[in-house]
Amino acid sequence: MLRIIFFTLFCLVLNAKEISPEFSLKTSGAVTDFIVENNILYIGTTASSIDIFSLEKKERINSITIPKIKDFLGDIIDAKIFSVDKINNKILILSQGENGGRNIFIYEDNKLQNIINAKDRLFIAQAKFLDDNHILYALLSNQIFIYDIKNSKIINEIQVSQSSFSHFVLSDDKKTILVTDESGVINQYDTKDLKKLNTFKGQNVDRVFQIDIKKDTILASGQDRRAAIYFTNGKVPFYKSFDFLVYAGALSPSSNLACVSSDENNNALVFDINKNEDKYLLTQNKAILTKILFLDEKNIAISSDDENINFYNLKIKE
């Protein structure tokens, strides 16, 4: 029976059109996170740097360097960037600190300000801007905090659950946050008061690695080898099964398409959510995928656990 299931999945993927990268960008270290704003790419790396690329020129135009750190043996090493974000002229950087702690920096006007220090021993897993004066960050212990930058204080916090934290995502308007963890459950909160609004569960039965939300559609990429789709408008949820862990995933701006890591060869599958139809197989990624991002409906950027970001144009196979 198991062989039949795997054969069926293999045949479905064969129906997807293979697409190789249109171009690639090489960074200063392994890519951990990236964002795009106004055709400018901001890339967090393992090499104590944020690399800044122009997508139009396809070249690096700047970089931000953060201080190196001492490891447990006293050796000087690069600080790994865990997450990066941007609002107006401010860039938010969450990075590895000494003794297992985390640093949060804000880069503005060519100056680097350390707003949360590794000495506080906070094991922060992810941080994003809520607005110009507030950030939202999550601890590995699955606590969510809203932090006032100007007054240097926490103004609200919640304990999501006793499960270890995996990932959070803000809605495009930043009015809600979705949080997921090792339980496979997704909780949605209002970012004004961190009041719980909804819970989505049942489609994943193990840790969810990443989540995304666009319009009324939620994508969950799971350790259970499932890509789960939930809807905030009451539509029936479903999941797609794969023969490998689904490490990363993203939704297109329209929420019509999803792209997820799909196999042990580091390929990514694009499928139509409304038709549950496999469309494209994005190939030539050389390591486990770390992030997928739709630049628009037809262009996708994919990073893996190496120094390259691949860019795919879906129009090529239309």
What is each of the regions a protein language model found here?
Residues 20-26, 59-74, 111-118, 153-159, ...:
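A short beta-strand motif characteristic of beta-propeller blades
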Residues 36-38, 86-88, 130-132, 172-173, ...:
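Residue-level detector of Asp-centered blade-edge/turn motifs that repeat once per structural unit
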Residues 288-318:
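Blade-level signature of beta-propeller repeat domains, shared across WD40, Kelch, NHL, RCC1
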Residues 55-58, 107-111, 148-152, 190-194, ...:
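Short loop/turn segments that connect beta-strands within beta-propeller blades
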Residues 34, 82-84, 127, 168, ...:
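Hydrophobic core register within WD40 beta-propeller blades
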Residues 23-50:
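Beta-strand-rich domains and repeat architectures in extracellular enzymes and scaffolds
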Residues 41, 91-92, 135-136, 177, ...:
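Hydrophobic beta-strand positions that form the internal "hydrophobic ladder"
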Residues 49-53, 99-105, 143-146, 185-188, ...:
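Structural motif
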